Amino acid sequence: KCCQVDEKRKPVAGTEFDLRAATSLAGADFNVGFGQLANRAESAEVAWLEAANGAATVVWADPAFRWLQLFTPADFPGDEGPHRAVALEPMTVPPDALNSGTDLRWIEPGDRVEASWGVRFRAASGL
């Protein structure tokens, strides 16, 4: 569960950026950050791309990842020429955090911070 925010970090529920329900990314042109991923005590699924048959590529992340960047370029380079691509990038801070200071964590010498995220395949039921 996440909530897309505009450049002022305001929720944009009900707009074209509200992807909480199943939404086709065909023809989409996104380069946006989503927030409010913090209400988790453990690693959890934070985003997924699901095929019509229910199979999905799932992104999971530890609670340290409070943000998710969605990028859908139409001109991603490939062997057969440019094509559409989708990137789901878990992030610990939102875009422009070095200027805004939002969610920045200072790591002092000798401190250790560990966080994990990953991608897995979820088969369609019945496969």
Where do the protein language model's features map onto the residues?
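A long-range scaffold signal marking pre-active-site subdomains of enzyme folds
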Residues: S43, R112-E114, L127
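Active-site/ligand-binding surface loops and adjacent short beta/alpha elements
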Residues: K1-A64
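Short Pro-Gly-centered flexible turn/kink motifs
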Residues: W106-A123
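Beta-strand secondary-structure signal
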Residues: V46-W48, A87, E114-G118
